[in-house]
Curated annotation (Swiss-Prot):
This is Pyruvoyl-dependent arginine decarboxylase AaxB. It comes from Chlamydia trachomatis serovar D (strain ATCC VR-885 / DSM 19411 / UW-3/Cx). It catalyses: L-arginine + H(+) = agmatine + CO2. The lineage of its organism: Bacteria, Pseudomonadati, Chlamydiota, Chlamydiia, Chlamydiales. One of its GO terms (biological process) is arginine catabolic process. GO terms for molecular function: arginine decarboxylase activity. Binds 1 pyruvoyl group covalently per subunit.
Length: 195
């Protein structure tokens, strides 16, 4: 029996950072730092598959903190994510990394929720930062990106934008920072019927 495409109905938000004095070329921050960031984000035992940034309306109100979802995690499972994550080397002049994910929801002419989008943010800083800087920069750039996604589609904003962010001040040679949405539950759209 055929079935249609899958779409997520339950998600969680999370974030993590990692740093190390060790790493393997060509991207040394991908080795140990990335694993440490996944561990801190509590998603280290998944096989991560990245998405682009389109959200079904069924996710509205169903995006939870990661700690509410960990009891449902399955070691070795595939976790589909929207992730803002990057690494850096301090010898390249980066002292801090900030990341964020923002969410917007659109409405139709009657004010009804129709669909959503996400946007990712990554910024490198030549000096250490604090949470206030990380949050303000994430919101500033994500707000611009989310509004662009709505404007591009000629869709009005349904509700307030949501923002999640994270940052690291790199104290070792290499660092990695990530903010992510992970998708846990799914349903299927109706299958296509071609006559």
């Amino acid at each position: 029996m055929p079935y249609g495409t899958r779409y997520p109905t339950l998600a969680f938000h999370t974030g993590g950072v990692g740093e190390s004095d060790d790493g393997m070329p060509p991207q040394p921050f991908e080795t140990f730092c990335y694993d440490s960031a996944l561990l801190q984000a509590k998603i280290e035992n998944f096989n991560i598959v990245p998405y682009t940034s389109v959200l079904p309306k069924e996710l509205f109100g169903n995006i939870l903190p990661v700690d509410q979802c960990t009891k449902f995690f399955k070691h070795g499972a595939v976790l589909e994510v929207i992730m803002a994550g990057r690494g850096a080397t301090v010898t390249d002049g980066t002292q801090a990394i900030a990341t964020g994910v923002g969410i917007c929801w659109g409405k139709d002419k009657n004010g009804e929720l129709i669909r959503g989008w996400a946007a990712e943010y990554v910024e490198f800083f030549p000096t250490w930062i604090d949470d206030e800087i990380a949050e303000s920069h994430a919101k500033m750039w994500l707000k611009k990106s989310l509004q662009h996604e709505l404007d591009l589609r000629s869709i009005s904003k349904h509700s307030e934008f949501q923002y999640f962010h994270n940052y690291i001040n790199i104290r070792k040679k290499f660092g990695f920072c990530l903010t992510a949405l992970g998708f846990l539950n799914f349903e299927n759209a109706a299958p296509a019927v071609i006559q």
